[in-house]
Amino acid sequence: MTTQAPPTSLLPLTPEQLARLQAAIGEYSPTQLAWLSGYFWGMVNQQPGSVAIAPVASAAASITVISASQTGNARRLAEQLRDDLLAAKLSVTLVNAGDYKFKQIAQERLLVIVASTQGEGEPAEEAVALHKFLFSKKAPKLNETAFAVFGLGDTSYENFCQSGKDFDGKLAELGAERLVERVDADVEYQELATAWRKQVVEVLKARAPAENAAPGVLASGAVDLLDSSPYSKEQPLTAQLAVKQKITGRASDKDVRHIEIDLGDSGLRYRPGDALGVWFDNDPALVDELVQLLWLKGDEPVEVEGKTLPLAQALRSHFELTQNTTPIVDKYAALSRDEKLIGLLADKAALQHYAHNTPIVDMVRQAPADLNAEQLIGLLRPLTPRLYSIASSQAENENEVHVTVGVVRYDIDGRARAGGASSFLADRLEEDGDVRVFIEHNDNFRLPANPETPVIMIGPGTGIAPFRAFMQQRDADGAGGKNWLFFGNPHFTEDFLYQVEWQRYVKDGLLTRIDLAWSRDQQHKVYVQDKLREQGAEVWRWIQEGAHIYVCGDANRMAKDVENTLLELVAEHGGMDTELADEFLSELRLERRYQRDVY
């Protein structure tokens, strides 16, 4: 591969260094060069006290791919597209949405966005600032820009792929040209993604001349040494359950488990802020119930990923049984010809409510149908792993990973139901039993690089998990920065998760402040946002001192309430109006001083 070097005056290299570099890279492919660019960028960022030098933009880097990822799927797809474009000898820059300088969007000529959706149709956390900018009055006209959008979502949520729809619609509204039609993909997105990637490459080959091709720098810092693990979502590590302990009281309405998994000598590495992906098997009793309701035996042969398996085994290990969706209800209504289900199809809100509140097995019980094994399999979605915020640091627990699991339990018509993964970990997986796991790295939820920086942690319920990891890491590092925890749950006596550990951190001086909100211990309900509001003046002082703010937990209610409270206290104590307070919080996001891990 040959490239035209930029003027040496623009490079932080001597002519001799540049000559050695050009000689060294001659044997590498474009894809390998792109990987190396991220690898060396990651090395620079890992060196204490180093100053990152902004890469010089190549005039040939005419395609920008933005990854707006929540659980890693959008990032992986964006990386695959980047590799496809490089293989086609096209110039491409891949950038994490959280690192994208969105005010430069008016200069983009060819733009591709791979966007996931979280919560109630909101953009991925790393894309919030970009989304806000595009929907603000400051968004520029994009008459010279051409774009493509791939949306990732989950049809079990009402606002399916809303983030992708938002980006696609707004870019067009701002005058940009749509290169290809937007794709809205469910959890089983691989086939759609493969076809879309091919289409995008062909379209871009006609728009971006290949003779000028040069691999773009991964603006996000891309490849990290921790990402070089042989284990992944597709090839998980088989680890062993070491500890399973209930950490809520007997009288608690919540069943929360502290789970410790032994990684052995696997070499699997993670950082505070990362998530643990857990593969699970469905409850055999649930499988039997579903099979019997459909008058099947369970030994019928079915095809799954090119293999022939007995139906019961396929249902246990390959398909989602605990999460219903509107497309499943739609398909089952047609198969069962049930009048009640057919009546729901005309009412979107009623259909969504039914799918959300009625497990598949109960839908079948309420509306019996005569299905064969293949029809049943065709109705269901593939099993997907669940992600749990990691509650430990390898600085303290080198060969272990801990998670905090809220077990989902409820009744439907007097029958006990439970979450697929949470009940697997709590009820069916025995100590020393095998569990398949992988690490989902989350660079959008990281402790400050400077150990002297103050930290404010807001995590009610199981949202406390990553902050246990944060404190273990700060303790091991001897970090001098102040630490403030806001935690809440229904009852002090039953629901104070990791109480002894927090009390020890307070006693040792590591945890500077702790504010606790017990919503059911008094007549009026008190939540973490109420405690945050009470301490508004002091929170503002910490922010002025450079504090980083972290929020973990429920995306639909808690995280929104906390953000509104932060806006209120910034406006009140910072002397700003609502618009300026919102801009201030957006700046904190861009500076990585306001980070959220919400779900």
Swiss-Prot record:
GO molecular function (one): FMN binding
The record's EC number reads 1.8.1.2
GO BP annotation list: cysteine biosynthetic process; hydrogen sulfide biosynthetic process; sulfate assimilation
Cofactor binding remark: Binds 1 FAD per subunit.
User: Pathway of this protein?
Assistant: Sulfur metabolism; hydrogen sulfide biosynthesis; hydrogen sulfide from sulfite (NADPH route): step 1/1
For the ligand (FMN), the binding residues are: 69-74, 116-119, 152-161
User: What PANTHER family does the database record attribute to this sequence?
Assistant: NADPH OXIDOREDUCTASE A, NITRIC OXIDE SYNTHASE-RELATED
Family the entry assigns: Belongs to the NADPH-dependent sulphite reductase flavoprotein subunit CysJ family.
Q: How does the record describe its quaternary structure?
A: Alpha(8)-beta(8). The alpha component is a flavoprotein, the beta component is a hemoprotein.
The entry's protein name is Sulfite reductase [NADPH] flavoprotein alpha-component
